């Protein structure tokens, strides 16, 4: 099935989920490319373009020997509102980040929060226009974020 054959809701949901998969796989180049023509907002920081986001994530996340951050982003409560006439959409969702590492057992939640997204349709496909990431909860991030202190 081609992308254009999918409903707008489904295409947008796929983008939301692709973000999680690419991050969990450690594929930072494709992760950043999701925002080639989009804003990525994290607290007071706003970045635009794939390379800027790739560089930010690469300088922030711990990548383990297997080439991944050893995480699973679980995105839930996805609420999508599409304006087909204007080729725009908004979405809200919640996320939890699970992680395990040799020195971080058992599997645990290291963070959780919300995504607030805007999308635009270009060339019959949906793309991120803006993602705002809010962190509501954090756990033991020593093996997830660079520069964290040992417990």
Language-model features, listed with the residues they occupy:
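Short, low-complexity N-terminal intrinsically disordered segments enriched in polar/charged residues
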Residues: 1-33
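Transmembrane beta-barrel outer-membrane domains
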Residues: 10, 71, 108-110
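Short beta-strand segments enriched in hydrophobic/aromatic residues
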Residues: 23, 35-36, 95-97, 132-135
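A solvent-exposed, acidic/Ser-Thr-rich amphipathic alpha-helical stretch
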Residues: 28-96
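Beta-strand elements of well-folded, non-transmembrane domains
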Residues: 95-99, 119-121
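Extended, polar beta-sheet/loop recognition surfaces of beta-rich domains
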Residues: 141-151
């Amino acid at each position: 099935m081609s992308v254009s054959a999918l409903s707008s809701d489904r295409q947008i949901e796929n983008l939301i989920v692709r973000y999680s998969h690419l991050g969990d796989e450690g594929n930072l180049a494709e992760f950043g490319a999701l925002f080639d023509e989009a804003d990525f907002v994290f607290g007071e920081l706003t970045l635009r373009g794939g390379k800027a986001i790739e560089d930010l994530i690469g300088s922030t996340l711990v990548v383990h020997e297997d080439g991944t951050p050893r995480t699973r982003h679980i995105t839930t409560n996805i609420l999508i509102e599409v304006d087909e006439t204007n080729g725009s959409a908004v979405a809200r969702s919640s996320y939890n980040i699970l992680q395990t590492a040799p020195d971080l057992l058992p599997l645990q939640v290291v963070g959780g929060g919300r995504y607030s997204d805007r999308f635009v349709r270009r060339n019959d496909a949906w793309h991120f226009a803006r993602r705002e990431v809010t962190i509501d909860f954090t756990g033991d991030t020593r093996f997830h974020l660079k520069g964290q202190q040992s417990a």
